[in-house]
Swiss-Prot record:
Disulfide-bond pairs as recorded: none
Species: Prochlorococcus marinus (strain MIT 9312)
A Pfam family this chain is assigned to: Ribosomal_L19
PANTHER family registered for this protein in UniProt: LARGE RIBOSOMAL SUBUNIT PROTEIN BL19M, RIBOSOMAL PROTEIN L19
The protein's name in its UniProt record: Large ribosomal subunit protein bL19
Length: 126
């Protein structure tokens, strides 16, 4: 009689293993208040190009493969916010332009401010 040892793998372990394979390893450390430049893949017809989107990170959410950042910038006098999934294939590159010094986890108060009041102090130690 040969006893077979069958390894039981739960569904959650399979999902976690798959998600860990899909994570991008080369992402920089991003903090709320940082000014970042995100390279977004745009497909027009059969052409693909990378369009830069630069702004201030006003929120970070979730973790792992579902991690997102909300980036706000002013375009032609109007505030524009975009939410990026960091591990998405649509995000081609991510570069921190400058570090920001803030004391909040979410910077939603920047939505109500205009002009120079929307600036974030620069941090030099990170």
């Amino acid at each position: 009689m040969v006893s077979e040892t069958t390894k039981t793998i739960s569904v959650s372990n399979l999902i976690e293993e798959f998600e860990n394979e899909q994570l991008k390893k080369e992402l920089p450390e991003i903090y709320v208040g940082d000014t970042v430049k995100v390279g977004v893949r745009i497909t027009e017809g059969n052409k693909e190009r990378v369009q830069p989107y630069e702004g201030v990170v006003i929120a970070k959410r979730h973790g792992g493969i579902h991690q997102t950042i909300t980036v706000r910038r002013i375009f032609q006098g109007i505030g524009v916010e975009r939410v990026f999934m960091l591990h998405s294939p649509q995000v081609a590159s991510l570069k921190v332009e400058r570090r920001g010094k803030v004391r909040r986890a979410k910077l939603f108060y920047l939505r109500d401010r205009v002009g120079k009041a929307t600036r974030v102090k620069q941090r030099f130690d990170r």
